[in-house]
């Protein structure tokens, strides 16, 4: 805000002596006013973000209900009132919460059955069904390799003055379909002939052997249909509004590429993300455990049998511009799967940032920049900057400086429930630039702030074996972690 800028600009210009009580009192009052104005701005930003989220949910539900009504009316114009009401009741969107213990037992998590409808204009072919539902599934815990859905709960007990924790168990999350998946979305690496050929082959195989509905990106749809009229059955979306309801139609996502393709697929979903099966066709593949040569066996297993998943946390970010309007830059939060990077861009000055964790001051960053990363992104830019590699299912936020101007500035790992605020001070000499998963750069000037917290919508990725085995395999094969020659041993001296 302009008043806060003026307050901070006035303070260093006014010489304050310890003997001048009036100036000391005035300086403290100005600082208190600036702090209060900043808190008001942050509160307004949080309220706007919450209102935007509720607005998005309302518009989504309204669009689905409106389309459902149009579909029912069009398909039953000659039906009587009683039959119409009966059909409408069968297509009711289920939005009420379900007690997990009543439908799945104490050790499983049910998916909500969400109405799957066809968006008008997305496909010109007629379909046999008026509407279909997404395939419901259950999430259960695997215990020490046993897929029976039972596990030991972690708890802390206090007995006879001693605090003890229960024995921990392997908690691999398993996904089991309650009905066969009906719709698969393909997300592919662009400008690759081999990926394009494999995508066409996989789409043909899924349609002929499993009768799966196929969604692809508009770019891929145009390429496939131009190449062969056989692919006229594939579906796509025409605008952002249709893309917002994509998660209500898609049961499974298949990515063909590297980690960048997985990041792009996750960015298409601003809310819930369907399970992702990632095939490795890129350079490094920390999130792509499946081999494209065995796609038939892999997809057959994922579509018909339980499989392990890794819930990869995402960060939700808001940019607050300290301007006269003092409004959040975007109505919806920016979701990132790897990291948010704040650097100095083209500026010749060091980046100067003030960092807060909830309401507690953390530190001031002076250096090339700062990385706020998820645990999935710990093997990306954060690792190159000296951060630790962290298992993707460890809940936390990585706080990694980039070339800090201090030998004691070491990386941190913070709990996942905190909210981080990184702001450019009013008296900063230069500006900063924020990028989100390597794209969408935004300029941050003096007084601007970036708010980051863990999103409630993770990205579930399918495991080849289990989350731990896949993670260790990726750092061994992808990074050649701790690879060295073994020390020779010639036996004891005689």
From Swiss-Prot:
Q: What is its EC number?
A: 2.7.1.23
Q: What class of enzyme is it?
A: transferase
* Molecular function per GO: ATP binding; NAD+ kinase activity
Keyword annotations for this protein?
Answer: ATP-binding, Kinase, NAD, NADP, Nucleotide-binding, Transferase
The answer to whether UniProt assigns keyword NAD to this entry is yes
InterPro entries attached to this UniProt entry: ATP-NAD_kinase_N, ATP-NAD_kinase_PpnK-typ_C, NAD/diacylglycerol_kinase_sf, NADK
The catalytic activity, as recorded, is: NAD(+) + ATP = ADP + NADP(+) + H(+)
Q: Which domain of life is it from?
A: Eukaryota
Cysteine-cysteine disulfides: none
Question: Which GO biological process annotations does it have?
Answer: NAD metabolic process; NADP biosynthetic process
Q: Which family does it belong to?
A: Belongs to the NAD kinase family.
The name this protein goes by in its record: Putative NAD kinase 3
């Amino acid at each position: 805000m302009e008043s806060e800028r003026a307050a901070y600009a006035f303070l260093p210009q006014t010489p304050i002596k310890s003997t001048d009580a009036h100036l000391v009192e005035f300086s403290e009052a100005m600082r208190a006013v600036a702090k209060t104005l900043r808190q008001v701005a942050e509160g307004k930003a949080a309220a706007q973000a919450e209102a935007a989220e509720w607005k998005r949910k309302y518009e989504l539900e309204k669009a689905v209900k409106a389309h459902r009504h149009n579909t029912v009316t069009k398909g039953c114009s000659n039906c009587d009132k009683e039959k119409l009401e009966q059909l409408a009741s069968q297509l009711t969107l289920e939005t009420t919460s379900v007690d997990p213990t009543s439908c799945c037992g104490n050790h499983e998590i049910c998916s909500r059955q969400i109405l799957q409808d066809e968006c008008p204009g997305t496909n010109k072919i007629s379909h046999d069904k008026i509407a279909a539902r997404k395939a419901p599934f259950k999430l259960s815990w695997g215990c020490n390799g046993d897929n029976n859905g039972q596990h030991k709960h972690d708890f802390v007990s206090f007995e006879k003055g001693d605090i003890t924790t229960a024995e921990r168990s392997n908690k691999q999350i398993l996904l089991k379909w309650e009905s066969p998946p009906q719709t698969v979305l393909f997300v592919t690496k662009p400008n690759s002939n081999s990926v394009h050929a494999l995508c066409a082959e996989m789409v043909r195989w899924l349609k002929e052997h499993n009768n799966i509905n196929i969604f692809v990106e508009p770019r891929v749809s145009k390429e496939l249909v131009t190449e062969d009229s056989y692919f006229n059955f594939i579906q796509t979306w025409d605008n952002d509004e249709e893309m917002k309801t994509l998660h209500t139609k898609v049961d499974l996502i298949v990515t063909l590429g590297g980690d960048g393709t997985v990041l792009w697929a996750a960015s298409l979903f601003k809310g819930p993300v369907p399970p992702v099966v990632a095939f490795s066709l890129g350079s490094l593949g920390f999130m792509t455990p499946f081999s494209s040569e065995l796609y038939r066996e892999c997809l057959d297993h994922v579509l018909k049998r339980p499989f392990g998943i890794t819930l990869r946390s995402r960060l939700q970010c808001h940019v607050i511009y300290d301007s006269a309007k003092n409004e959040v830059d975007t109505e919806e939060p920016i979701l990132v799967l790897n990291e948010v990077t704040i650097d100095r861009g083209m500026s010749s000055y060091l980046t100067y940032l003030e960092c807060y964790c909830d309401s507690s001051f953390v530190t001031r960053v002076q250096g090339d920049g700062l990385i706020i990363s998820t645990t999935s992104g710990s093997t990306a830019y954060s690792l190159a900057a000296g951060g630790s590699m962290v298992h993707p299912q460890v809940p936390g936020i990585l706080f990694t400086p980039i070339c800090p101007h201090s030998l004691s500035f070491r990386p941190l790992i913070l709990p996942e429930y905190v909210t981080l605020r990184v702001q450019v001070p009013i008296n900063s000499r230069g500006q900063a630039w924020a990028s989100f998963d390597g794209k969408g750069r935004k300029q941050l000037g003096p007084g601007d702030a970036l708010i980051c917290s863990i999103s409630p919508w993770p990205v579930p990725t399918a495991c080849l074996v289990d989350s731990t085995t896949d993670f260790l395999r990726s750092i061994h094969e992808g990074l050649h972690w701790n690879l060295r020659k073994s020390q020779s041993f010639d036996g004891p001296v005689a």
